[in-house]
Regions:
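Feature of Fe-S/electron-transfer and energy-metabolism proteins
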Residues: 1-166
Length: 166
């Protein structure tokens, strides 16, 4: 048909370059998609539409497949074209029934009031720590028996990495 452009989402050259550099010499296997989505999320604090399209191209998978996987999981922050970049830090507050009963809704409201838009505060699905509810996740660090002060302390200390047991 001789189209002057390809069908579908047009790739952004800088995004293609960034994703290619980020993946380096890692294999472009379909079963590594989630791992690479985590890599993009951790590097850029979000997954832009341009980066998602570039990843799909790099891995030679349909854009729809990459998008479906990225948007299925609550931990990935997928931005649509034109969306403003997210704040540098996200605090996720567990919304499981147990966390709700232990005050998660009030915790969410208190944190949102305190941080305004400087730190992104969002609801999150169950984090599997019902025995220490309510739970909040600062970056990748879980604050158990979370209170506004405990979460603020983790944010202030930039305690954003997971703790691994000895």
């Amino acid at each position: 048909k001789g189209r002057p452009y390809t069908k579908g989402r047009q790739l952004v050259a800088t995004a293609v370059e960034e994703i290619s550099e980020l993946l380096g010499d890692r294999p472009r296997q379909r079963d590594l998609l989630i791992e690479y989505l985590h890599l993009i999320q951790d590097t850029y604090n979000q997954i832009s539409a341009a980066h998602l399209a570039a990843l799909a191209e790099e891995m030679r998978i349909p854009m729809a497949e990459a998008y479906e996987v990225a948007t299925f999981y609550a931990h990935f922050d997928v931005l649509k074209e034109g969306d403003a970049p997210l704040p540098e830090l996200t605090v996720r507050v567990c919304q499981s029934l147990t966390c709700e009963m232990m005050g998660a809704e009030q915790l969410l409201a208190d944190l949102a009031d305190h941080y305004g838009g400087v730190v992104r505060v969002v609801r999150a699905p169950c984090m599997g720590r019902c025995d220490v509810a309510p739970v909040a996740e600062v970056g990748h660090y879980h604050v158990v028996n979370a209170t506004p002060d405990a979460v603020k302390s983790a944010v202030d200390l930039k305690h954003v990495h997971p703790e691994f047991p000895d």
